[in-house]
Regions:
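An alpha-helical appendage that flanks or caps ligand/catalytic pockets
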Residues: 1-108, 140-163
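Structural preference for beta-strand elements that scaffold enzyme active sites
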Residues: 1-3, 116-119
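Flexible loop/turn segments at secondary-structure boundaries
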Residues: 9-14, 124-130
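Outer-membrane beta-barrel pore domains
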Residues: 93, 120-123
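C-terminal subdomain of alpha/beta-hydrolase-fold enzymes, centered on the catalytic histidine
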Residues: 97, 120, 128-131
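A structural motif corresponding to the C-terminal end of an alpha-helix
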Residues: 108-115
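C-terminal helical cap(s) of enzyme catalytic domains, especially alpha/beta-barrels
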Residues: 125-145
Length: 163
């Protein structure tokens, strides 16, 4: 099974959701992001200046996340940029918007990428997962993209039900 990690950020309006995203993302400092990224890479990034272009580094430990060193527009990113983005969402897609637009984004992602589902990370707790369950899941259910009930008793049962 292929499950994609996402970070849904849900608001009453698109502007409200963007504001929540900005507030969340602003909490992450370069130093904090570097610490998280260093731990995930098992490599101390504090030895490099913040303006280091990550694609130019050849250390073997840095190669496994190489695709994350390029911005959405194709521009190579600095260590500071990569660190902040990694600290904000650990490299997961932030799906931001109203419940309907988040459901639309999820549906489109699956249509394009394929896969079997999503794993969610919350930007805050309590509240973020509850918002998703109460506001997005009903939309996905109406579209036939989320089941109404589960017949198994274990995670394995749930994941292999449609094999």
């Amino acid at each position: 099974k292929i499950l994609f990690g996402i970070q849904p950020i849900i608001g009453r309006t698109e502007a409200d959701a963007k504001k929540k995203q900005q507030q969340h993302n602003d909490l992450v400092t370069v130093e904090g992001g570097k610490a998280i990224l260093s731990a995930h890479l098992d490599f101390d990034l504090s030895q490099f200046p913040d303006d280091t272009i990550m694609l130019e580094r050849n250390e073997p430990q840095l190669q496994r996340m190489r695709t994350r060193y390029v911005d959405f527009d194709g521009r190579p990113m600095t260590l500071a940029e990569v660190a902040r983005r990694h600290g904000q969402s650990v490299g997961l897609a932030q799906m931001v918007g109203t419940p309907k637009s988040v459901a639309d984004q999820m549906e489109e992602f699956m249509r394009v990428a394929g896969g079997d589902g999503f794993m969610l990370t919350a930007i805050h707790s309590p509240g973020a997962i509850e918002d998703f369950v109460d506001k997005v899941v009903p939309i996905l259910r109406k579209r036939g993209l989320v089941r109404e009930e589960y017949t198994g008793t274990t995670l394995r049962d749930h994941l292999t039900q449609f094999d």
